[in-house]
Curated annotation (Swiss-Prot):
Protein name in the entry: 2-isopropylmalate synthase
Molecular function as annotated in GO: 2-isopropylmalate synthase activity
GO CC, one annotated term: extracellular region
Pathway: Amino-acid biosynthesis; L-leucine biosynthesis; L-leucine from 3-methyl-2-oxobutanoate: step 1/4
GO biological process, one term: L-leucine biosynthetic process
Class in the EC hierarchy, top level: transferase
Major subcellular location class: secreted
Keyword Amino-acid biosynthesis: yes
EC number, UniProt record: 2.3.3.13
Protein family according to the UniProt entry: Belongs to the alpha-IPM synthase/homocitrate synthase family. LeuA type 1 subfamily.
Subcellular location: Secreted, Cell wall
Functional description taken from the UniProt entry: Catalyzes the condensation of the acetyl group of acetyl-CoA with 3-methyl-2-oxobutanoate (2-oxoisovalerate) to form 3-carboxy-3-hydroxy-4-methylpentanoate (2-isopropylmalate).
Catalysed reactions listed for this entry: 3-methyl-2-oxobutanoate + acetyl-CoA + H2O = (2S)-2-isopropylmalate + CoA + H(+)
């Protein structure tokens, strides 16, 4: 689920 957090960055 790191993909979602990376998108916010």
């Amino acid at each position: 689920f790191a993909q979602l957090l990376n998108d916010l960055k």
